[in-house]
Amino acid sequence: LGTGIIPNNYMSNFDPHAGRALSVVPGKRVPTSMAPMLVLQDEKPVYALGLPGGLRIFPSALQAIVNLIDHDMTLQQAVEAPRIWTQGQEVELEDGLAAQKPGLEALGHQVKLVPHIGGGMNAISFGETMTGAACWRADGTVLALGGGLARPGVRFWPDKAPEDEEDAAAG
């Protein structure tokens, strides 16, 4: 039996009107807002990125991708760039876009300045080398581990050699 408890603010993901795909009904599962992104070029990965942030994940990730592709930003610049968000009501702007507030208000938008939109984005660019980036919105940091990809004979448990496994299988 369910408890009736909805985690975080996920009730906003449901439609309050009956008879629709996301209408509130007993036993309905909470939709999620996960959006790990891969950007491909010629079927090869160019960028991978993701972040926490509920409903603000999708537009935040897309803004970073637009910044990378259309505005030629570096990976670090793209994940740290100021963000904008709306769900049809007021427009939220991070402080870095505060200069846009009067223009948006002149167009009839209600604008709210906020310290951050979405969570701390992390990203990787793939090329001759891999480059990582983490933004200021969270305590994330870039960490790289060397050693190359796993090869035949490489095991997670150093005390168990491949020969031990073969002997056990044959025994």
Go through each PLM region and give its residues:
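In a subset of proteins, long, contiguous C-terminal domains/tails are tracked
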Residues: 102, 106-171
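Proteins synthesized as precursors that undergo proteolytic processing into mature forms
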Residues: 1-117, 158-160, 167-171
